[in-house]
């Protein structure tokens, strides 16, 4: 199975470009569709391997047959959005590393806060 995996920072960049162009009414026609993504399809298993590498753990996989309504491969057609200046730059591996680093830091702070709260509540 292949998908167009895109780092959230690249999506935010694209949204900002579309909004800027819409507000300035330079290139963007209102009510049109502007796709965001990388424009490249990648294997789901490659994505999972990158995630496993970054987490230092092997995922427990449960392989199932494809659902009849599922699509084997998808990718965004970003040609219209590229004309506005959108160009995703984050690789899958870099995006996963950025996300895992953020996730660990965010939940470390959340865990520290919860532990402090528990110590304050203790009687």
Q: How would you describe each model-predicted region?
A:
Residues 1-123:
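C-terminal substrate-binding subdomain of Rossmann-fold SDR/epimerase-dehydratase oxidoreductases
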């Amino acid at each position: 199975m292949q998908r167009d995996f895109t780092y959230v920072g690249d999506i935010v960049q694209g949204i900002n470009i579309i909004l800027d162009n819409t507000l300035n009414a330079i290139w963007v026609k209102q009510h049109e569709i502007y796709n965001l993504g990388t424009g490249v399809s990648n294997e789901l298993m490659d994505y999972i391997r990158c995630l496993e590498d970054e987490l230092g753990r092997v995922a427990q996989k449960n392989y199932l047959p494809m659902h009849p309504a599922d699509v084997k491969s998808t990718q965004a057609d970003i040609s219209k959005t590229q004309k506005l200046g959108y160009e995703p730059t984050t690789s899958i591996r870099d995006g996963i590393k950025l996300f895992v680093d953020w996730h660990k830091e965010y939940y470390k702070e959340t865990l520290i806060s919860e532990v402090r709260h528990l110590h304050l509540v203790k009687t």
